[in-house]
Amino acid sequence: MKQQGVTIWLTGLSGAGKTTITHALEQKLREAGYALEVLDGDIVRTNLTKGLGFSKEDRDTNIRRIGFVANLLTRNGVIVLVSAISPYRDIRDEVRGTIGNFVEVFVNAPLNVCEERDVKGLYKKARAGEIKSFTGIDDPYEPPLNPEIECRTDLETLEESVTKIWQKLEELGYLAKPVAI
């Protein structure tokens, strides 16, 4: 059976758990034999979108470029895991429309929880005024209105979040369901 491509787009505040969920889901998908690629927002910024700042226009350009690569992979039968803050609803919706096979995962944790998890000290720097236009502090995050999946990482375990995503992908027909014998 030929694998169907899909982009699984994890969005949420810095520290919400996007990368953690992405790595766990990646491992489970690889173990099951699926072809996939991961596009992590931090890694993409240092390679594909180097030189872009954090204005709305630059952030939109960043997300469009990630979406462009995700679309190329998706239409060639690859499962693409995108882990990116992608704070603006309009650009996420634009990318969804371009890709088609698109599953939005809202990785949701309250701001105070994200700040507690902040090992890099980014929130502290943003609150001190050392980082400008930091999402959730002095730049908005627009939560998805109708994501296919919401993972409440302050209330559920990593395993519960991954299982929730896996089950939705099966339900939508992107993953083959095991055959009962």
From Swiss-Prot:
A GO term for molecular function: sulfate adenylyltransferase (ATP) activity
GO biological process terms held by the UniProt record: hydrogen sulfide biosynthetic process; sulfate assimilation via adenylyl sulfate reduction; sulfate assimilation, phosphoadenylyl sulfate reduction by phosphoadenylyl-sulfate reductase (thioredoxin)
Xref: SUPFAM superfamilies: P-loop containing nucleoside triphosphate hydrolases
Class in the EC hierarchy, top level: transferase
Residues of the active site: 86
GO cellular component terms given for this protein: cytoplasm
Ligase listed as a keyword: no
EC number(s) on file: 2.7.1.25
Pathway: Sulfur metabolism; hydrogen sulfide biosynthesis; sulfite from sulfate: step 2/3
UniProt keyword annotations, A-Z: ATP-binding, Kinase, Nucleotide-binding, Phosphoprotein, Transferase
Pfam families reported for this sequence: APS_kinase (PF01583)
Reaction equation(s) it catalyzes: adenosine 5'-phosphosulfate + ATP = 3'-phosphoadenylyl sulfate + ADP + H(+)
Record-listed ATP binding positions: 12-19
Family to which the UniProt record says this protein belongs: Belongs to the APS kinase family.
Purpose: Catalyzes the synthesis of activated sulfate.
HAMAP family: Adenylyl_sulf_kinase
Protein name according to UniProt: Adenylyl-sulfate kinase
Organism: Rippkaea orientalis (strain PCC 8801 / RF-1) (Cyanothece sp. (strain PCC 8801))
Protein encoded by which gene: cysC
